[in-house]
A protein has these predicted regions:
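Hydrophobic/basic alpha-helical segments
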Residues: 1-390
Length: 390
């Protein structure tokens, strides 16, 4: 988003690996754990015991194939699975660094991105990087899946269109054209970061479960209804909702309508009853405040642990050259200049996070534990949301 504010378009590539967790070579994994991460002795023996000795068979129509000992793969649903995959593919980060691209990696999800001038769009560095990554995967028994890998240009409509018109990116021998949107870890990101398609998907999924809740509501208690609502519907509204800061008022309204209907369903009030009163009774924050709640909690964690680094480095403490009353108020510096004045900048974490944090009371910002911060924050946002409401 900041690149777009600086009149640069960004190109993002989401790489997909075929049967990622099933193709990890046990011998390579253990050698890498020893040589690069210093896992030796009993710890290495335990690791080898954990990944080896597993068997599998195929069952079709009641007939089972012979049992085969697995020489590759780690349990995908295990706690260690993503960590072992990250350990196995750790050299990929060095390849990306060599080509001066930025990246995010979580288990088998890898995204490469870079920003380019719209007038001088050159995909050479991206192409060379994907070629080297494909070669490394092949040498280590893994394979990129070009049919599920995606490329997207992000920026304003003009910037995104210019980047998308620059050509295609070759992944594992196949030409992958630019997409209008990509789905990353359950969030659909479009080329203008409007989140229109993502919110449509969220609303559709919530309404499906809301209809089911209405059907069974007379048969269950209010407490059970609240549990069902939170686990099946509110969780969808809250998932990655900090990304929605700066989205259109129309999108926020669509989500708010879902939450209003949910509150009425839980309390079994009519459609013409006050949604605000239902939300207050359930002690639920409205959508906008839920977004601000998630952002504020994220900032608090970043200030305490400075992790992840790619986010913590975007937050700068507010400092004055001389001592003022604002010096000890735990404020963050808000970006200034042309970027801050652009409407698109409200979607940038480096812009909206300090703004949300600085809007909190000093009492809230000074909380010494995460639990006390969450309690104080929710109370503060609740009062702000419902004071003077009809």
């Amino acid at each position: 988003v900041i690149a777009a504010c600086n009149r640069r378009s960004s190109v993002l590539i989401a790489l997909d690996i075929s049967a990622a967790f099933d193709t990890i070579d046990h011998d390579i994994l253990c050698r890498r754990a020893d040589s690069e991460f210093g896992i030796r002795g009993p710890a290495l023996a335990w690791l080898r015991s954990f990944v080896s000795g597993r068997s599998s068979y195929v069952s079709v129509g009641g007939t089972n194939s012979p049992v085969t000992l697995n020489s590759t793969g780690v349990p995908q649903g295990s706690v260690l699975g993503p960590m072992l995959f990250a350990l196995y593919t750790s050299p990929v980060s060095k390849i990306i660094d060599h080509h001066s691209l930025q990246y995010h990696m979580y288990a088998d999800d890898t995204q490469l991105y870079t920003s380019l001038q719209p007038s001088q769009i050159d995909l050479t560095a991206i192409q060379l990087c994907t070629n080297d990554i494909h070669r490394w995967y092949a040498e280590n028994g893994m394979m990129l899946n070009p049919t599920k890998s995606e490329v997207i240009a992000v920026g304003t409509r003009v910037q995104a269109a210019a980047a998308a018109a620059s050509g295609t990116v070759e992944i594992a021998g196949s030409q992958v054209p630019f997409s209008s949107d990509v789905k990353l870890l359950g969030v659909t990101i479009d080329s203008t970061v409007s989140f229109d398609k993502h919110i449509s998907s969220v609303v559709r999924g919530c309404n499906y479960h809301l209809r089911a809740l209405r059907h069974i509501r007379p048969l269950i208690t209010t407490d059970v209804a609240k549990s069902v609502a939170c686990s099946l519907i509110s969780s969808r509204l809250d998932y990655c909702n900090s990304l929605l800061h700066g989205t259109s008022a129309k999108n926020i309204h669509r989500l708010q309508v879902v939450q209003n209907d949910l509150a009425r369903a839980v309390l079994m009030t009519g459609r013409r009853s006050s949604a605000t009163e239902s939300l207050k009774t359930l002690h639920w924050l409205p959508i906008t405040e839920r977004i601000n709640y998630k952002i504020a909690v994220t900032v608090y964690k970043l200030r305490q642990s400075h992790s992840p680094q790619y986010l913590s480095e975007l937050l700068v403490n507010y400092q004055q050259p001389r001592t003022l009353r604002s010096s000890d108020k735990l404020l963050l510096r808000e970006p200034e200049g042309p970027v801050r004045k652009l409407a698109l900048s409200t979607k940038a974490f480096s812009v909206f996070a300090p703004s949300v944090w600085n809007s909190l009371t000093l009492n809230c910002r000074m909380c010494t534990s995460l639990n006390s911060f969450k309690r104080t924050l929710k109370t503060e946002l609740f009062i702000k949301a419902y004071t003077d409401q009809p």
